[in-house]
């Protein structure tokens, strides 16, 4: 287990650190040659379900990039697989739900499961990753948040307008609430299993919450996200991350979390002021900025750090995941710039 005074964990508690810690969403991904070599030999699900391979993918970016935390290699939709909805991963369309949830009867047909029986491979990956990291940096566990997972279940895949999701919310709020409660319970068990296996922080990904109006988020999402966060193992830092939610920041803060993760569509200083300085903030470089020349990357890193003002509680990250084809040397340059420009 990593020393609790490690800069990443200290930043989660809004304590002073010798520099601003940095990690990246999708830091283990297609932009890395090591990942592509494994992916050429194994399916995506094989990589997720073989702890030896998943742990290798989890740890490699720490060694390669010099980041201050590892994040578990898995997929947010794995949690849906034991519910009996026919989760499939296709090369053409990505993850697809074969039996989408569209009615109250569909919600009632969802299978309950025990996390320790459904996800032994995930928890073993956590243990193997922690052993390989050897206390050098902490491991972050993660899950999709209730709304984003519900949207996948209802839409059957990606969506531009979330028509089916909003139709269920508006036409049958009772079924919607029942679905969100089921998902919240499942997420709590899943994340607490990761924590028990060695994860020292967790992140909730609410990647699709930006499609909601403030009133809809307040009524139909906030209570369930809050219940999820409140159900997690006490003392474990929680990062509440979402995208496209500049209009919802105060509500997201009310939903909970020790750190609020924001994207590049809002200035970091404005976001932090709006959520309050009694929580930490994570972000918020545009992932596309990593395609810029290294001196421009360094300038943009410096601007974000300037907006953070050296205040304890800032964790540097992108506003979303690392994109495929991102130059690895540019990622390394970004990490080095964060460490050098924030040294105190």
Protein language model annotation of sequence segments:
Residues 36-48, 104-115, 253:
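Short, basic, glycine/proline-bearing loop/turn elements
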Residues 92-132:
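A gly/proline- and charged-residue-enriched helix-loop-helix capping module
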Residues 118-344:
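Active-site loop segments of alpha/beta catalytic cores
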Residues 81-85, 100, 150-154:
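Short, conserved acidic/polar surface loops in the N-terminal third of protein domains
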